[in-house]
Structures are given as C-alpha cells and as structure tokens.
From Swiss-Prot:
This is Small ribosomal subunit protein uS13. Belongs to the universal ribosomal protein uS13 family. One of its GO terms (biological process) is translation. GO terms for cellular component: cytosol; small ribosomal subunit. It comes from the Bacteria. Located at the top of the head of the 30S subunit, it contacts several helices of the 16S rRNA. In the 70S ribosome it contacts the 23S rRNA (bridge B1a) and protein L5 of the 50S subunit (bridge B1b), connecting the 2 subunits; these bridges are implicated in subunit movement. Contacts the tRNAs in the A and P-sites. Part of the 30S ribosomal subunit. Forms a loose heterodimer with protein S19. Forms two bridges to the 50S subunit in the 70S ribosome. The lineage of its organism: Bacteria, Pseudomonadati, Pseudomonadota, Alphaproteobacteria, Sphingomonadales. One of its GO terms (molecular function) is tRNA binding. InterPro entries: Rbsml_uS13_C (IPR027437), Ribosomal_uS13 (IPR001892), Ribosomal_uS13-like_H2TH (IPR010979), Ribosomal_uS13_bac-type (IPR019980), Ribosomal_uS13_CS (IPR018269). The keyword Cell membrane does not apply. Keywords: Ribonucleoprotein, Ribosomal protein, RNA-binding, rRNA-binding, tRNA-binding.
Amino acid sequence: MARIAGVNLPTNKRVIIALTYIHGIGRKTAVDIADKLGIDHGRRVQDLSDAEVLQIRETIDADHTVEGDLRRNTAMNIKRLMDLACYRGLRHRKGLPVRGQRTHTNARTRKGKAKPIAGKKK
C-alpha cells in the first residue's frame, strides 16, 4: 500500500484516480504529475515500484500544497477575513452564504435545518 502525504492510496485503483484521494490534488494535477514522471495513466497503484512511489511523493512534496498545510492555509485565510470584519468575514462568522447567494429561500446548507416559527401559518 502506497502512503503519500499521510494518505494511504487504494491499491486496486488507477494511479490518476488514487492520487485524487489526497486533499489538494484533483484530476488535472494527478494527470500532470503522472505525465511529468512518465507513469502510464492506466497503471494501478499496486503495480508501481517503490522508486516510482518515492518519485511521486517527492514531486508532491516539492511542488504542491496538500493535506494539512492546505487545510491550515484555508482556515487561516477564513480566520483573517473574520478578524478583518470585512463583509465576507462577517458572513463566515454568521454562518451565511459568502458569495452573494440568496438567503430568503434556500441556503439551507450554510444556515442549517429550518427552525419553525410559532404563529407563522397563513
């Protein structure tokens, strides 16, 4: 089992798909990494040699921000917005949509489950 960036990659999947299990690596980045290292897109993780896994690990460590570092960066960016008390920061703080979506209806993902209001029947 290949372990890259603290993530155990599934051995029976193709390399491109398995790399997307790492937070911060999508399909495009996975294809770019495979092309850079000359790894065939159809190869399975279990067919990779230890040297190839090491190459992938070194490439990801050198060129990409992944997993914990990426999560930390994202959290720090949101915290910075909240500390600035700018509009986006206030929306984050209140748990409302940040990017201008409507909230009169919908927005249930950010607002949570609907709370009934007494005497609101028509």
